[in-house]
Amino acid sequence: MPELPEVETTRRGVEPHLEGRTLLGAVVRNPSLRWPVPPDLSERVAGEKVLAVRRRAKYLLLECESGTLLIHLGMSGSLRVMPAGAPPQKHDHLDLLLGEQVLRFRDPRRFGAVLWHLGPVEMHPLLQALGPEPLSDAFDGAALHQAIRRRGSPIKLAIMDNHVVVGVGNIYANESLFHAGISPARAACDLSRADCDRLAAEIKAVLRRAIDAGGSTLRDFVDSEGKPGYFQQTYMVYNRQEEPCRLCGTPIRQIRQGQRSTYYCPLCQP
């Protein structure tokens, strides 16, 4: 599933092709995504100038003169800038028309979304209750400590909660906890302020390194040019069960938390 680094990589890739351009309409081949594509999407976006391409959590926001397009990549989605005449493939569900180019939305599993919103986009129901951005100044050890101090859930599940901090999915939660030296099973409320300072710093560092590497490609993700990410080559724990820890040699363990796999080193993360 594309997480924050993959969505940010996509944003940076499509921004030069979209910002300042006028949308000519849309071609919707399959409206049955996680939420139905508006039936009049082409009419709504035709003539709209793209003022900015932003990201909020795992949502891409194409801010136009009259409204905002919200795009979520779901479990397997990607966006690519293609020549207008490029024939669509099986899972290419939607094109935004840019003249000689199109922005093509591909989503094999159809858990993504393309929605149109009028008014302040921060008030959209999908966005209005979100926590702070992990790479912003609003997220630090103090903010993390305040958000989790009454939570008895495991810390890994806490940092994956979008009310605590947005965009930290399973891959990057595992990696951040390893670098912070914190067991994923520790109760969130048991973390000290020093623990939270360390964890917040590592979340930022891991996400920045992942963005610099173009994100992670485990199955479907490619960037706007069709290229895979490379951060998976540097994983310390994720998907490395029974392999030796890169720091101490102890076999990496795998457990289940919240219906997801968790990976950790029992020696480095006591």
Curated annotation (Swiss-Prot):
Disulfide feature: none
Gene Ontology terms, MF aspect: 8-oxo-7,8-dihydroguanine DNA N-glycosylase activity; class I DNA-(apurinic or apyrimidinic site) endonuclease activity; damaged DNA binding; zinc ion binding
Reactions catalysed: Hydrolysis of DNA containing ring-opened 7-methylguanine residues, releasing 2,6-diamino-4-hydroxy-5-(N-methyl)formamidopyrimidine; 2'-deoxyribonucleotide-(2'-deoxyribose 5'-phosphate)-2'-deoxyribonucleotide-DNA = a 3'-end 2'-deoxyribonucleotide-(2,3-dehydro-2,3-deoxyribose 5'-phosphate)-DNA + a 5'-end 5'-phospho-2'-deoxyribonucleoside-DNA + H(+)
Residues that coordinate or bind DNA: H91, R109, R151
UniProt protein name: Formamidopyrimidine-DNA glycosylase
Biological function: Involved in base excision repair of DNA damaged by oxidation or by mutagenic agents. Acts as a DNA glycosylase that recognizes and removes damaged bases. Has a preference for oxidized purines, such as 7,8-dihydro-8-oxoguanine (8-oxoG). Has AP (apurinic/apyrimidinic) lyase activity and introduces nicks in the DNA strand. Cleaves the DNA backbone by beta-delta elimination to generate a single-strand break at the site of the removed base with both 3'- and 5'-phosphates.
Organism: Chromobacterium violaceum (strain ATCC 12472 / DSM 30191 / JCM 1249 / CCUG 213 / NBRC 12614 / NCIMB 9131 / NCTC 9757 / MK)
Family from the record: Belongs to the FPG family.
Hydrolase recorded as keyword: yes
Key words, A-Z: DNA damage, DNA repair, DNA-binding, Glycosidase, Hydrolase, Lyase, Metal-binding, Multifunctional enzyme, Zinc, Zinc-finger
